[in-house]
């Protein structure tokens, strides 16, 4: 479980650039790469833009840049991970839609064991594999095309479908097991849910949000001279968000993952 908070842009919903800053968030290592920030799937006026940012430091026995969250027994990783991106909202078939790009970057160090059983201490840094995402609403309010539409927005119960695809162009060295890039294609199909709880009044808004999803992984055919194959990974994220004031909100977050053997 983690705690996050953010600032509400008083111009949110208007055309132009809206900045969403989610800084100083504390994520457990298993959720750092794949967990989307709370309120990410709230709808806004078509033609809007946002710049999400997440920064976290962590230790554990899994590489935070690897979306499969493969646990390495006996390993100890330390890293600082930043996720920066850009999202654009638009209308498609009268439904709210969004396209986004997320770029991971940071540093990672740790003690790992190669497939041949050799122990090694490594340190890497750079850019990971960027992810592109497409999301469209299936159930919920129609796309917001005018300012009055945005002012009347209430999510009620909203259901979306999303598709992610990671592009394997991050920093990668096939001679070492620890990398920020993964040297393989992978992606996710999910169904974001936003459920409004109570009145939709700025300063009092509360939502319960879920993201059930499945990750699919291609093979890394050059992993320290071996081929790495990974089973699908099943994911459920949950966020309970609440306004503290009209311009400040917080959330309680939890995540469950299974698979990726």
Predicted feature descriptions by range:
Residues 50-54, 98-100, 133, 160-162, ...:
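Residue-level detector of the transmembrane beta-barrel scaffold of outer-membrane proteins
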Residues 46, 58, 91-94, 106, ...:
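Outer-membrane beta-barrel channels and translocator barrels
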Residues 53, 84-88, 132-138, 163, ...:
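Residues on the lipid-exposed face of transmembrane beta-strands in outer-membrane beta-barrel proteins
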Residues 58-81, 118-120, 174-179:
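Surface-exposed strand-loop-strand hairpins of Gram-negative outer-membrane beta-barrel proteins
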Residues 64, 72, 220-261:
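Outer membrane beta-barrel transmembrane domains
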């Amino acid at each position: 479980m983690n705690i996050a908070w953010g600032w509400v842009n008083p111009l949110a919903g208007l055309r132009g650039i809206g900045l969403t800053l989610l800084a100083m968030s504390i994520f457990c290592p298993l959720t750092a790469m794949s967990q989307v920030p709370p309120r990410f799937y709230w709808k806004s006026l078509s033609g809007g833009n946002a710049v999400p940012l997440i920064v976290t430091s962590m230790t554990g026995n899994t590489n935070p840049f690897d979306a499969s969250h493969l646990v390495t027994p006996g390993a100890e990783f330390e890293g600082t991970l930043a996720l920066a991106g850009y999202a654009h909202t638009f209308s498609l078939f009268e439904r709210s839609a969004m396209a986004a790009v997320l770029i991971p970057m940071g540093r990672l160090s740790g003690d790992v064991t190669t497939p041949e059983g050799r122990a090694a201490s490594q340190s890497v840094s750079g850019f990971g594999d960027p992810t592109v995402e497409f999301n469209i609403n299936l159930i919920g309010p129609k796309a917001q095309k005018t300012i009055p539409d945005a002012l009347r927005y209430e999510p009620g119960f909203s259901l979306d479908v999303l598709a992610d695809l990671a592009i394997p162009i991050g920093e990668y060295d096939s001679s070492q097991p620890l990398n920020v890039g993964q040297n393989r294609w992978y992606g996710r199909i999910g169904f974001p849910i936003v459920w409004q709880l109570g009145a939709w009044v700025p300063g009092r808004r509360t939502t319960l949000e879920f993201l059930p999803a499945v990750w699919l992984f291609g093979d890394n055919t050059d992993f320290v001279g071996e081929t790495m194959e990974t089973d699908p990974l099943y994911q459920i994220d949950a966020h309970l968000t609440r306004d503290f004031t009209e311009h400040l909100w917080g959330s309680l977050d939890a995540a469950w993952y299974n698979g990726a053997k």
